[in-house]
Amino acid sequence: MEKIESYFVPFGRLLLAVIFIMAGASKIASGGAGMIEYMESAGVPGILFWPAALFELIAGLMILVGYQTKLVAFLLAGFCLLTGALFHYVPADQTQMTMMFKNFGMAGGFLFLARFGAGEMSMDNRASSED
């Protein structure tokens, strides 16, 4: 069982990272079509589209490889809480409320990474073992 358990953290990082990698890449590829208006309808300035899209992509990749994991996971936890509250708090819409709580659940996963780190199979661990 120990051998299998050694893959839990990197697999968990993959599961947490993939949504941000895909969302960031998709937003960048779309050039903001529809998203800027959606952001503005929630009271978020459209000028934040590009920084948010780049953050999603880069932060997702950093979590995937386990680089600067504690910091990036903390930032992603905040991002998930903020976007969940800003874009998905619609009490009359059960789907949006489910999306909000999904974001909050991901924030919980990121807080675990922020506290405990990326694990053995990560760039963070590789860098610390070379010191």
Positions of predicted regions on the chain:
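Extended, low-polarity transmembrane helix blocks
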Residues: 1-30, 37, 46-54, 58, ...
